[in-house]
Amino acid sequence: MRSSDCGAVLAWSVKMHRWPVWASCIAYSILSLLRTSPIQTTSGDWAIAFCTPMIRVHGDMRRINLPEMSAEEVGNMVTSVMNDHQRKIYQQNLEVDFSFELPNVARFRVNAFNTGRGPAAVFRTIPSTVLSLEELKAPSIFQKIAESPRGMVLVTGPTGSGKSTTLAAMINYINETQPAHILTIEDPIEFVHQSKKSLINQRELHQHTLSFANALSSALREDPDVILVGEMRDPETIGLALTAAETGHLVFGTLHTTGAAKTVDRIVDVFPAGEKEMVRSMLSESLTAVISQNLLKTHDGNGRVASHEILIANPAVRNLIRENKITQINSVLQTGQASGMQTMDQSLQSLVRQGLIAPEAARRRAQNSESMSF
């Protein structure tokens, strides 16, 4: 079968922690494929694509030598790892997001979908061990943020920027240091936490609850100290998350925004005009921090590291949000390093000085490359 005749593409995107050594024989079974691929690897994102086999290494696509597959073969492989409920959603919606675990191998987050060539899927491995904030080389202010008794902490960035990994590390820090009740609401569950000093309950959309809003509404009666909302997708979920933060809970959430000011705007903009002033007031009182991040290839090419824009909601920031002067937040970021704040450009400069990324990589991602000095 020629590559151009291929009826489907199966892609596998994984986050790993040491270079893998591929087994010489990979069968036409997704379980065999995943089991024959060691997960003990260096930090990076990998992807495998069939019909035109490729693998993504730290953001770069590379071809690999794997057999081509028909649309029927790909479809059978994809549905073989679904349960009945996931298979039903896939058949009805033509796409589904879920996770599953191969014992003694890894957990995988899967997005199955359909294309003009037929069924397709993307698999991403979820490390069995949650990395610590130190292992992620996260700024020390992250620990202080995680120690907040209440408020809203938003981790934002584009898809694949490591938001889930950062949140998992912060939840793990709380779990290791505080006697707290931590409740997570995810779609799907990615990192599996074991209770340590804290009690952790993890709920998955469509498995343990019908919606984020339902789970958040119930959470207020489940006596949590910390609530993780996997995605803040709609006004109802965002409103309930703000209420939870206002009523004394520490709420973690994610948004696909780039930058603190854009994050504040996004939250306010999802509400009708008549509610925006009230939402700004709630956000000004409940916001603790906004962490916006991106991943960059390390200087040695053997991994990736995150750069962060960090906004701490001090009185000046709260006042700007309340008075709808969001554009002035960037000025506060530039002068707020004493309290742990930093702009993305300041973070990039720091990573260059630490020898973690190349100056050229920093300049490509900088908002104002001309002002950067190393």
Swiss-Prot record:
Official protein name in the record: Twitching motility protein
GO CC, one annotated term: cytoplasm
Function field: May be involved in pilus retraction.
GO molecular function: ATP binding; ATP hydrolysis activity
Disulphide connectivity of cysteines: none
Principal cellular location given in the protein's record: cytoplasm
PROSITE patterns from the UniProt entry: T2SP_E (PS00662)
Family according to the record: Belongs to the GSP E family.
Binding site for ATP: G157, P158, T159, G160, S161, G162, K163, S164
CDD domains with a match to the protein in the record: PilT (cd01131)
Locations listed in the record: Cytoplasm
Keywords carried by this UniProt record: ATP-binding, Cytoplasm, Fimbrium biogenesis, Nucleotide-binding, Transport
NCBIfam families noted in UniProt: pilT_fam
Organism superkingdom: Bacteria
Keyword Transport: yes
Coiled-coil ranges per UniProt: none
The organism of origin for this protein: Neisseria gonorrhoeae
